[in-house]
Amino acid sequence: MQTLIHRGMAALHQDDFAGLYTLWSGTSALDHLQEADLALLMQRCDARIQAAPGDAGPWWVKCLIYLDRSAHFNSNREQALRTVADWAGRAIGLAPDKAEAHRLLGSAHYWLDEHAAAIGAYRNAQALQPQVDLQVRLFEMESLPAGQSPQLLQLDFRDGNACHYYGAGVSIGKWKRAGLDPADAGYVDAVQFALYEHCTTLFRQGLELGDAATCNTDTHTFAMCCNNLGILYMDRGLYAQARAILEEGLRHSQFQFLYQNLREAYRHQGMRAEAADLALTLMMDYELDTPLFLDCAQAACSHLNRVGRHADVLEIAEAAQEAFEALPDDAQADPELLRMYALVQAHHRLTAARALGRLQPQQVDTALSRAAAEANPHDLDTLFVHASALGEAREYPAAVDAYTTLIAQAAQQQDAQALKRARHGRGYLLLYYLPDAKAALQDFLAVQRDGTDDFYTYYYQANCHYVLKDYRSALPACDAARALLDDAMLQADPGSAAQLYMMEANCHMNLGAYPASLAAFERSLALHERADVRESYELARQLAAKPKKRLFGLFS
């Protein structure tokens, strides 16, 4: 944008008002000028009119200033637009064969809702120079009110001004509405897509030329076009293309909606880290409404917990609490807001606090998780948050009941991953806290039958058999879990791997297979040196070293 402004100022220095108009028309350049600069620019226009009364350029620039920033000069918008119409008429008198003044006259009447006058002026401008955004406006004023189908719109793409294609795309997008004929809606969507794509092509060409470009190269408008095109790509399920065009836009200008849509594209492509980074950017750099803030907060917290930034999660949770508690009571009861807030406070915050050793059962807000679950009885994530919160609060029977509700709902919705998570959660509580290892085993066997098993499925199966002293059944489960151990798993959770090997070793020892027991103990101790495991290992060594007693001592 600064480059575009500097190029415009260079044209002004040369008294090239027509060149300045060409550079800044259709851009947001004037929006970036201070009020003092606007006043100075208007003075320069007036001085040029006095010095060169036959030059239409300064009249074009005056019209452009009033169309975009009239509030600085006249608080009455209607009067300002009448002034634009007067100035445009003078410019037409000086250069009737130039499309610019006819366009400006048409725009003054368009914003005054004087469509008949606007149509006449726009038609004159279009006859002198094809302008794709005017073609859309003409169809909008003439054909749509007459009930004609949008499919009758035929555009002339000889216009070389990239900003016109962006403006046309925005205008035609307003034609989309509920109840629009599907064929008409499809046509409008296709035309809008073509307009934005051509806009980006022209912008790229202009940016490659740099200072040699004769058209405007407003990078902010380019970024806005990339944003809108990205939305259309996502509407088509083309998330890789959406990501690429949104990232391209972000290289030229940064604004909230561009970040939001790029974050959405990242989420659809499973790029959690990148989406979380943008969520943090949005929360830090922009004033977000509470729903968006909570959505960003829950996504960011999920990723930050995953990468070990637990203290940051607690900070975000505190900010989310302030935002939520500032809402009126009726807003706090909104199911969607409750869902997101509970995810932050009753799940991510607890995960972070537990990782930092700060979690106290009495700190768990089960009332919040219960309210969220009651408001969202079919949302599987919310039901899981409530069940896990009850577990953290050590309300184990209630937590098992909540997991049972979740299992039924997940089965009804045929969500295999939610079903696995719920069965793991309930089985874990039954195994370690109630305890009921036999019932817990049924949950882990069910996960295996569903085909969603992983290391922990077999690890918990082995633990259930071990607790039930069914060592022969525990060993195949240990083998299955060990087969799923890889370097990443060992690095992420060496404690569980060590515990698995310890169970395997004890099973072998209880069955009298001392050499196998020794090997398993050594694997366990290599991951985690524990005094009790070391003691068992030494015992296994002693037992392995003793000669086996034969029947009746005949071969001893």
Can you name each region flagged by the protein language model?
Residues L20, L41, V84, A118, ...:
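Single-residue signature of alpha-solenoid repeat helices
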Residues M9, L64, A71, S107, ...:
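Residue-level recognition of tetratricopeptide repeat
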Residues G57, E100, D133-Q135, N161-C163, ...:
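Start-of-helix register in tetratricopeptide repeats
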Residues F17, E35-L38, L81, H115, ...:
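TPR-repeat structural position
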Residues S28-H32, C63, D68-S75, W111-D113, ...:
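Short coil/turn linking the two alpha-helices of tandem helical-hairpin repeats
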Residues C45, L81, A88, Y122, ...:
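Hydrophobic/aromatic packing residues within the alpha-helices of TPR/SEL1-like helical repeat arrays
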Residues H6, V61, L104, R137, ...:
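"A position-specific structural signal for the A-helix of alpha-solenoid helical repeats
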Residues P53, P96, P130, F157-G160, ...:
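Short coil turns that delineate tetratricopeptide repeat
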